[in-house]
């Protein structure tokens, strides 16, 4: 996605239910960006990601859901997320934590962005980054990207059984993200 990182043996690596991910240190916080929590075919319900071998990098933010073009003046200042790479396979999340100890039992805060289910992303504004909140609140912070607008809420049920849940795909993504948090943090 255009970001390049130099990895070292000291970068934090954690085990998820699907496999290991490599994050990075951000001041006093450990950060893991763009972790896939689910996968789905277009207009279908999300499924858990398939397990992998080796270590996947969680060093850069993942894709945001494709967004409608907005032509209001100065929109790039108000909503810089429209310049982030967009793709319908946007079921990813970001985690910031002070501790890698699985027994630490820190409170977890999950950020589901606004936007009326048609706009927004987990990374649309610098204020959504969880490193400061994690550091000063001593909590684990998770921000979630999920399907929006027609990719997440278009009712295609009249076109057959295959699409019976299409109007709830975006909500199902959020539930899948919460399940991932429950299973992995």
Language model segments and positions:
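Non-catalytic accessory segments of hydrolases
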Residues: 1-171
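Alpha/beta-hydrolase active-site loop
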Residues: 164-185
């Amino acid at each position: 996605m255009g970001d390049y990182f130099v990895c070292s043996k000291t970068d934090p690596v954690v085990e998820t239910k699907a496999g290991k991910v490599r994050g990075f240190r951000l001041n006093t916080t450990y950060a893991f960006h763009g972790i896939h929590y689910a996968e789905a075919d277009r207009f279908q319900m999300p499924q858990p990601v398939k397990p992998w071998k080796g270590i996947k990098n969680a060093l850069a933010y993942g894709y945001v859901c494709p967004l409608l073009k907005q032509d209001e003046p100065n929109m790039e200042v108000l909503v810089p997320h429209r310049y982030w790479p967009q793709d319908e396979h946007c079921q990813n999340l970001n985690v910031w934590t002070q501790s890698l100890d699985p027994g630490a039992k820190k409170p977890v805060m999950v950020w589901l962005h606004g936007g009326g289910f048609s706009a927004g992303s987990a990374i649309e504004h610098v204020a959504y980054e969880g490193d400061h909140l994690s550091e000063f609140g001593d909590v684990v912070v998770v921000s979630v990207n999920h399907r929006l607008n027609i990719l997440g809420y278009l009712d295609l049920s009249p076109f057959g059984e295959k699409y019976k849940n299409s109007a709830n795909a975006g909500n199902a993504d959020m539930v899948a993200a919460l399940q991932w948090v429950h299973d992995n943090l």
